[in-house]
From Swiss-Prot:
This is Endonuclease III. Its EC number is 4.2.99.18. Its cofactor is [4Fe-4S] cluster. SUPFAM superfamilies: DNA-glycosylase (SSF48150). It comes from the Bacteria. Binds 1 [4Fe-4S] cluster.
Amino acid sequence: MIEELAREIVKRFPRNHKETDPFRVLISTVLSQRTRDENTEKASKKLFEVYRTPQELAKAKPEDLYDLIKESGMYRQKAERIVEISRILVEKYGGRVPDSLEELLKLPGVGRKTANIVLWVGFKKPALAVDTHVHRISNRLGWVKTRTPEETEEALKKLLPEDLWGPINGSMVEFGRRICKPQNPLCEECFLKNHCEFYRRRGKGEVRNRTER
C-alpha cells in the first residue's frame, strides 16, 4: 500500500530537474539551502553566467560571488563554501564531483540531503534525499515513526523500491508546499486523507493543533 501511495504522489506532483550536470547540481543545491526555489534559480543563473567550471570558481574570492548569489540568502557563508568546495574538487578530484555518498559528505556544507540530491539528479544513482517536507509527511501519513531526517531516510529505503527513492523527494516537496503544509495542512482537500494517520488522529481530537506532526 505504501508503495502505491508513494507512486501516486510522484504521479500527481512530478518534479523535473532543469540542471543535471553534477557540478551545477551540487552548487545549486548549496545555494538552495534555506531559501525558495525561485531565489535559487536566479542566483544559480547569475553565478554560472560568470563562473562555468570548478576551475574558474576555485580561483575566485568569496567576495567576488556576493552580488551574484545575494538573492539566495546567507550569501557570505554560501560564497565561502562554494569557493572552498570548488578548490577541493580541483585539488583532490581533478575538477570532478565525486559520485559516492562518503566522498560527497566530506565536502564543506554538504549534508546527506545535498549529497543524495547530487547522486540522484547528477549521477542517476538510487539515492533518497530527505528534507523537512519528506520527514514531516512520512511521519504524518504513518509510514514511519522517526525523530530525524536521517532515521526517515533509512526507514523509507526499507519501505520503497529503489526506483522511487529519487523521485519521491521532489514530489513530496511539492505536495508539502501545496497540501500537507507545515502549518494548517489542507487535510480535507488531500487525496491521501483516507490513508493518513494524522487525519484520523485529528478526527478523533488526538491532534491538539494543526502544526503537530
